[in-house]
């Protein structure tokens, strides 16, 4: 990160004299691919098992008519006097029949995720919260935020009234993001409307605390605002929808505890046997590396630029003499000397004739 120090702001929005060093986790590589892979797997683990009824599609009496009637052998509803009689039943191709391969509750619902991969994704999501461009690209209204990452005094953890908590968020510049959430509430499209998912709305700021002294209850009824403990940060909250750049408000105690949780060059992580991931190259400016004197002295100079013709007309060398000479320069001498029409010279008598003459003399 380009910011080695972060200023702590009071609950009134004023900058204090405290300046905290940036924790090492914010220098972790930002890997959207790993975050997306881990998110899609972890997000499946909270699903509730569902299945169709075992009796669905079979709650009727139907028998096949057998062969000889020039109709399909599918079971058919008996009786008469109604349109249902004679109709096919049970099969998945029939109206009112069961589905193909009915769903079962013993499906494998959970997905195993590598422990280190999950930690890598969480560290990347934390590092992305400190990049203002990613936070803006995710849709958060942080134009009036003093700085990112935003660190607030630890007094925020002791607030027990929702009115006071909302006033503190407004004071630090998060009011625009709260209004965005309120205006985004819309009726869900689809069948989720009558499956207890009737409304949709955007995500607001995530408040990370070190110790809950009332902040969780104070903010739990504010639309879009979520809370999380710094010791158990969740990827589903840090990167909702696998989109990096969640707007996070850190308390001072939580911000200073990040090095203890994730570790640094001097402090060991509380996670057993874990070390923070590091970049493959220390300098992200690849152009500067390529143009450096050390690299330029070791590579050969660029040759002449070649321009590839967009369309090449292929010509037959057997019919086009210029193309033939380009492919085989010896063809000119071959034609001038008429070597193709000359007969091969006899080098001498055949061995069989010599052998016959020898026998005659003997």
Curated annotation (Swiss-Prot):
N-terminally acetylated by acetyltransferase NatA. It comes from the Eukaryota. Keywords: Acetylation, Cytoplasm, Methylation, Nucleus, Ribonucleoprotein, Ribosomal protein, RNA-binding. It is found in: Cytoplasm; Nucleus. The modification N-acetylserine is found at residue 2. InterPro entries: Ribos_uL4_C_dom, Ribosomal_uL4, Ribosomal_uL4_dom_sf, Ribosomal_uL4_euk/arc_CS, Ribosomal_uL4_euk/arch. One of its GO terms (biological process) is cytoplasmic translation. Residues 277-362 are annotated as: C-terminal-extended nuclear localization signal. One of its GO terms (cellular component) is cytoplasm. Changing residue 295 to A: Leads to an inefficient release from ACL4 with a delayed assembly into the 60S subunit. It holds the Pfam family Ribosomal_L4. Changing residue 314 to A: Significantly diminished nuclear localization. The modification Omega-N-methylarginine is found at residue 95. One of its GO terms (molecular function) is structural constituent of ribosome. Present with 151000 molecules/cell in log phase SD medium. Component of the large ribosomal subunit (LSU). Mature yeast ribosomes consist of a small (40S) and a large (60S) subunit. The 40S small subunit contains 1 molecule of ribosomal RNA (18S rRNA) and 33 different proteins (encoded by 57 genes). The large 60S subunit contains 3 rRNA molecules (25S, 5.8S and 5S rRNA) and 46 different proteins (encoded by 81 genes). uL4 is associated with the polypeptide exit tunnel. uL4 interacts with its chaperone ACL4 and the nuclear import receptor KAP104. Component of the ribosome, a large ribonucleoprotein complex responsible for the synthesis of proteins in the cell. The small ribosomal subunit (SSU) binds messenger RNAs (mRNAs) and translates the encoded message by selecting cognate aminoacyl-transfer RNA (tRNA) molecules. The large subunit (LSU) contains the ribosomal catalytic site termed the peptidyl transferase center (PTC), which catalyzes the formation of peptide bonds, thereby polymerizing the amino acids delivered by tRNAs into a polypeptide chain. The eukaryote-specific C-terminal extension harbors a nuclear import signal and delivers the ACL4-uL4/RPL4 complex to the pre-ribosome, triggering uL4 release from ACL4 and incorporation into the 60S ribosomal subunit. Belongs to the universal ribosomal protein uL4 family. This is Large ribosomal subunit protein uL4B. It comes from Saccharomyces cerevisiae (strain ATCC 204508 / S288c).
